[in-house]
Each structure stands twice: as structure tokens, then as C-alpha cells.
């Protein structure tokens, strides 16, 4: 690829969907903005690949250039400024806060959950160090003065990928894709209302249940949401489809890369499957995830995507590249494979003693019936995103948890408001 891998998602049209991530970290005490501002600008030194701004290359393509200006930290405004704007010193990230809540805003082009987590954790670590005058034991957190991990700033390329035949090719059973919900959530001003609910679970409850039912954290929430939708969707929809993202970085020799290159596993649940017990559903789900995250399958999916990006490189002109990207993106065209819902699990975050200062962690993105699951200390946090305010789905999800005797705390709904990006022309 001619340009940084971290730039290509910037060609996406943000008229409807916003391609940024907003992470909400709730501290146990009120946030001190002066300490936070200093801590954030110490922490960014650890992440030079995030301290960048967008510039135009000679072919009109987006490039990233070093940006040594201050990372902006502000009180949460009534309207969030654009990423890449002068208001945020042209950075593709900034921080705002209100009360005990710290919001980390970053372009999804530069990273996904795997890349965002270390940056957020370093910021919170440094804030705790400066605010409380302590040195918390947190070996899982990358310290501001620590060197980059081997390959942390490396980016993938087509020649890294194996060309062996995939051991498995997913064949869609044509699950329902909630078309009316999406149409209302995207185009109907009277129905569109992006928001999220926030769940807190005891990690021990989920892990114990998963262990007893041949499940993992990810497969548990896939099955739980599928069962919830089975309660409320008409019988005419014969298949409910779950989807989960997978980061195959280790499969291509880049286990420490910050870049957001993902593949997806699909689990199609025929309605008769919901007569199965939780153990059988867990086995079915995990077996599909294992098959579809095999390195041969991941490389097959990535080759298709990287080949598309190399076609973008051949187009001259910024406007022309954006048009080509929009018309040919394999993730959004007619051949794209979509499920009914998505569950993403970023894994357990080892905050060490820093967790003593943190109440909760929420990852907020665009989506409908999209769950972002994270784990910290003894808790599991779930953000439940929707494009329209329709309580029936979250109510059914709660009912499933009640039937499984899984305790939870539910908060929200909260508005899902995230910044768009301003790009050079």
C-alpha cells in the first residue's frame, strides 16, 4: 500500500455513520482538568503513531505527518469539535471530561479496540500518578517512558499474507438484517436516535456460567443476544445472525501492531437452535468462531481487503479516491455479509492497582444491536448500541439474563454522540 494503512478508513463517507471511537472512563473521584491535561500530554509521547495530523500526498491520497502540537483536553462542550480541526490542533484525537467522566475521542481509522486500550490505560495511569502522588503497581500498562514494543508501530501489507486456501468458507444462511430499523435509524429524522445502554456484570458470574456451558465471554454474549432477539423477532425471519470481529495480527507475525485490521466470524442461528440448551449453543458458537478465525481464513479475508486498498492507490485525486472507496468497499457493497447483530470483545484489561481509581470503562461506536464488551478487574462492562430508541431489544436481553440468573446493573439510555473528522481538501 502506498499510504499508511491507518489512513484508508478516512475515505469513508460520514454523512450518516461516524467513524470515531469514544471511550468513557469513569473515575471514582472528580477529575482535575489541569492534572489531566498535563498527564495526557506526557502520555502521548509514548504513542508517536497517534501524534499525527492528516496531509495530502502527491496523488491526493491521505498521509499522516508528525504533529507536535499539544493534545487538547477540554470540559465536555455542548457540541464536540471535529477531529483534525484547528480547535483540536489538527490531531485525530482529543480528550474531554465532565465530573468523574473522562472521554477519549479518536479516529477509528488509526486503531480499533486493541490499539485504543493501551493508549487509554497509559493516560489514566499517568493521571493517577500525578493526581495522587503514587506509583501504582500496574505491569500490564505501558508507561509513558517505556519503549515501543517490537513491531508496535508496524503496519500490515499484502505481501505478509499467506495465499493458502482457507480451511473454511462461510456460506451465509441469509439472516435477517433489521432493514427497517436501519432505514429509520439512518434516514428518518423522527426515528433516528443513536444511543447506548451500559451494563455492568460481575466477572465471576459470567466466567462461572461460561465454564459450565462450554462457552467463552464472547460466545456467551453472542448466544445471549441471539436468544433475546429470538424472543421478539417475527417467526418469518428464519435465521438470526451473529457477527464478531477478530484481530488476526498475531497470525501474520504482527502481535503488537496498533493498526485496526480485522476479520469477522459469522454465526447463523436457525430458529430451531433456540430449543437447544445453553451448553449446546455455546459449543455451536465457539466451534464457528474457531473455524472462522483460523489463520488461513483470516489471511483469505485480509487479502481481499488489502487488494481493494491497493486499487484505491491507483486512483488519482482526493475526491476520486473517496468516490471509488464508497462504491467499491467490500464491507459495505452488495456482496458484503452482514449479521443481525454484532458482539465485539476486546479482552481483559490488566489495569493492576490503577483499577482501584477507576469505576468503569465504556467503548462507544456507531451501530445497531452492537455490543462492545470489555473486562476490567472483577467486572465486565457492556455497551449496547442502537440507532433507534426501541426498548424491546434491551428488555429482551435483560429477560435472558434474568432467566439465566445472571445479575447485572443497567444504566441509560445515553445519547451516542461522537466527533466526525475534518480532512484537508
Predicted regions and their residues:
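Short, well-ordered loop/turn elements at secondary-structure boundaries
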Residues: 97-99, 212, 337-338
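Conserved catalytic core of two-metal-ion nucleotidyltransferases
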Residues: 63-65, 143-144
